[in-house]
């Protein structure tokens, strides 16, 4: 590992520990040339997942883009940043564990909606309105109907 101070490649590891819930290793190092101490993180290299957009354009999955979209949908709700990060982590983990090389933006959006539906209805509606490109009040009403409990005896007087 190259020293950030003198660029020497000889260093020794002073301490190693698991970090980021076991997803990486944090190492404290010391340069053998200048005694500068620095921290490195070792992570498993993952194969990037390509998102196929509605226009058939392709782009690499971007965690920050997903995080920003969820944060906007969850503004002024009871969902805190830790929960948003946890949702993004779950989706990212699912993508890596499924060994998908590509995923459609439609499938990705449905995964997000599935998480939001069980967490917060307002965030779900906000995200769905953008993701599903609502054109009017009917789209909102149809989506809101999915939250009503299906009770076949409710209509009987």
Swiss-Prot record:
Signal sequence residues: none
Residue intervals of every unnamed zinc finger in the record: 3-34
Keywords recorded for this protein, A-Z: ATP-binding, DNA-binding, Metal-binding, Nucleotide-binding, Repressor, Transcription, Transcription regulation, Zinc, Zinc-finger
Start and end residues of each ATP-cone domain: 49-139
Transmembrane segments: none
Family statement drawn from the similarity comment of this UniProt entry: Belongs to the NrdR family.
Name of the protein described by the UniProt record: Transcriptional repressor NrdR
Organism for this UniProt entry: Prochlorococcus marinus (strain SARG / CCMP1375 / SS120)
Gene behind this protein: nrdR
């Amino acid at each position: 590992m190259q020293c950030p101070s003198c660029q020497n490649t000889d260093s020794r590891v002073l301490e190693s520990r698991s970090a980021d819930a076991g997803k990486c290793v944090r190492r404290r190092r010391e340069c053998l040339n200048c005694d500068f101490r620095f921290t490195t993180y070792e992570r498993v290299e993952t194969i990037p997942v390509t998102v196929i957009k509605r226009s058939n354009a392709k782009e690499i999955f971007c965690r920050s883009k997903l995080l920003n979209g969820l944060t906007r949908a969850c503004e002024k709700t009871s969902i805190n940043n830790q929960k948003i990060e946890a949702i993004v982590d779950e989706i990212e983990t699912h993508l890596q564990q499924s060994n998908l090389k590509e995923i459609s933006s439609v499938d990705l959006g449905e995964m997000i909606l599935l998480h939001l539906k069980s967490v917060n209805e307002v965030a779900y509606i906000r995200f769905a309105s953008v993701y599903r490109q609502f054109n009017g009040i009917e789209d909102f009403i149809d989506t809101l109907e999915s939250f009503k409990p299906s009770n076949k005896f409710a209509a009987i007087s």
